[in-house]
Structure formats: structure tokens, C-alpha cells
């Protein structure tokens, strides 16, 4: 009767058939482990239980239990998803969960007739970590799509035993795929926010009423990530306010993104096209060419402790630029925009390897505009002024 009353409000963990008293020669079960059902973290799986053979520490033998507790459904995901790597025929949905989950995305041209997408790696669903990246394939250019994220917690997963937990389904979000036929679009470009929330809020107020198509964060907007939690927090601090769940976001590395312990870890949280921090993409009839110019000081600067090799990265982009500038996508585009955090031209740093590396390649190319940042001083250079081979707009710093 005693155990029956306990089970009304508790989930039993211990094995009631194993005696625990007296410690030297146990004959009775007087010790129990139980979890209160009202805690909201209901016990899901008892992974192991043991009555320890300890005869002298107490007159009762100690109990040890290893438990796996469910994560409540409402806490499986506490951030919005964000769209990455937008293409006419695909879109990448990225999100982080607060527990490892069986995850998929339901999507379609309406919210009723949907199909399911998930990430399969070598025949297995990728459900071993809180980072999730799901690509929606076979989309039609210039079409509106609806999607939602669906989660089932994985409370316990081993070779021959899997226990599913609570579920969560987000609301439906919507996005529009780009089309090569688009001739007009609007993009928001932010740079050098440096976690200054007041500056970001002031800039966001200027965007009220603007129907934009995508957002570019042109460097130093995710500065110096200390660890994964800090990196995730910074990403959502900038993507959630601009509706990154419905407006694709393009992250460009600045020199502050590549500092601190977790800087390389950022790669798994950002949907870089083809896994590269530089590249090119089309939005409508416009070709964007993106460069990652690395740090603003030489690789052998003492503060880098011999761990950087941005010289190789810049040289790789020489080869990329040569191929890109003669590519069909570049040549057939009606407009061309060059984007980099550190300016190739209009840079005030003492260390300017990129002007020498890329200057001769870029001069004479049909770029309509270059967007850059880094200097923390807003400036516009007409073609032919200050050594600019095409118009250059340089964004300012985070002061308000």
C-alpha cells in the first residue's frame, strides 16, 4: 500500500525488490529513488540502477540511478529558424534545438499540401546534436513557399534502444525563392554591429515599412564567439529581429568573426554556399561576388600565435576570381555587386594585401557597386575617386 500511494505522485526509479537494510546483510527494502511527476521533467528512461555494496558508511546501502529525463515540448526549440543559401531551386533551413531531436521540415506552396524534408547522412538521419540544417530541394524559382519545423525529442538513443520524448511543431513560415527573371529587389545590409544592440535597434527602426527580399550581414556582426552558446545567441540576436525565418540571411565574415575560441565552430552554424566563406550568387539579374579578406594584420602578428593562414585563403580567392570573372553567370548578369567586409579599395589600414592581389583583376570589370565596411566611417566613392575603379559604398561603425 505504501508504494502504491507513492506511485500516485511519483515515478519509481529504484528496484523495490532489492533489499537495502541493514547494510551488512540487507533483508528489507527501506530506500527508494523516485521522481515527482509534477516537476514537468517526467522521468522517461532509467538507464541504469544499482544498490551499492557499501557496508560501513551507513546502516542503509546507497542507491545510484542514471536517468534520462524528457525535455518538455515547449523547450525543445526556443529560437526561430533562419534561412540560408537562397537559390532559385532550393532553400536551407537552419535551427538549433535545446535537446537532440528527430527533426524534419514540412513545406509546400500552401500549408495544407506539404512534403517532408530531413537531413540524411549516409543513409541515416542526422540526429546526434542540437545543430540542424535541412535543405529544401526541387523548389520553383520565384514561388512562395510555406514551411514549419517539426521536432520529436530523443530522450535516449543507443544501438538497440531508442526512446522518443515530447514533440514540438512551429507555426508556418513563408519565403519566396529568387528568380533569374527578377529585375528589382530590395536588400538590407548591416555591418560592424559589434553586439551593440542600441545601434542595431536604431537601424532596424529605419527599416520599418520596407519590403525587403533578403539581408546581408557584412562582417563584424557576430564578433569573437567564445563558445557555441555565445555563437548561437549572437546569430539569433541579429536574425530574429529581421525575420530571418522568412527572409534569407547571408553572413559575410569580418576580421572579428575569425577571432576567439569558437570562430572556426561558426562554420557549422552558418550555411555557407559550398562550404566556402567566399563565392558568388545571383539574385534576379544581379550577380553578387563575395570575398573574405581575412584578418587586418599579417599572419605572423604575435597575437595570432601562429594559428592563422589567411595568405592561403586570399590566394585561393585569386583563383576563384579569375574563374568567376570569365564565368557565364557573371558575363550574362545585368548588374554586378562586389561585397567584402574589409575594402579592396578605400581601405585605411596599413596592411592592404588585397589591393595588390585583386586590384588588377577587378579594374575594368563591370561592377556597378562595391559594398564594404571595417573602417567604421561611412563614405561613398564615385568611380575614379580615391582609386576606386567603380562606385564604392563603405558602411559605418556601431556608434549611435
Predicted segment positions?
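Active-site beta-strand/loop signature of hydrolases that rely on acidic residues for catalysis
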Residues: 1, 34, 59-67, 95, ...
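Active-site neighborhood of phospho(di)ester-bond hydrolases with catalytic His/Asp-centered motifs
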Residues: 1, 12-16, 188-192, 214-220, ...
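Active-site environment of divalent metal-dependent phosphoester hydrolases
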Residues: 1-4, 22-28, 195-200, 223-226, ...
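Metal-dependent phosphoester-hydrolase catalytic domains
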Residues: 2-75
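Conserved beta-sheet core of the metallophosphoesterase superfamily
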Residues: 3-26, 30, 35, 132, ...
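Acidic, histidine-bearing metal-coordination/catalytic regions of metal-dependent phosphoesterases
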Residues: 39, 58-61, 66-189, 208-210
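Extended active-site neighborhood of metal-dependent phosphoesterases/phosphodiesterases
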Residues: 150-176, 229-326, 357, 361, ...
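Conserved, compact domain cores that house catalytic/ligand-binding motifs in diverse enzymes
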Residues: 183-261, 270
